[in-house]
Amino acid sequence: MRVSQKGIDLIKKFEGIRLKSYICPAGVLTIGYGHTGSDVYQNQQITEEEAERLLRRDTESAQQAISSFVSVKLNQNEYDALVSFVFNIGPTAFVNSTLLKLLNHGADRKIVAGEFGRWVKAG
């Protein structure tokens, strides 16, 4: 399964776009649609096309984590929501999350969805 355009649009909506690098509320240098990493530097500027490429690349690690660690079948909406979630918190936090444990142990999806609320924006 792959993230859909609807899933990409969800991330874009939550993240917003910034074409000049900035310090996010968590204190991390960020650009585009929430892209972070050693390739982001002070006063960096990118185009919307570059921001889109970075977002697509960044969602790959989220999708790899889901593929590697989720052991239950997901529908497209669930998958897209998980990609957005893992994109935001990172694969390591996802692998250690209660959300993943509940999901893999077959918990009711409403209970699993309730776990999203435990993760709030930094700052």
Regions found by a protein language model. Name each.
Residues 1-28, 35-64, 69, 92-123:
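Long, amphipathic alpha-helical surface segments
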Residues 33-35, 85-87:
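Active-site-proximal beta-strand/loop segments in catalytic clefts of secreted hydrolases
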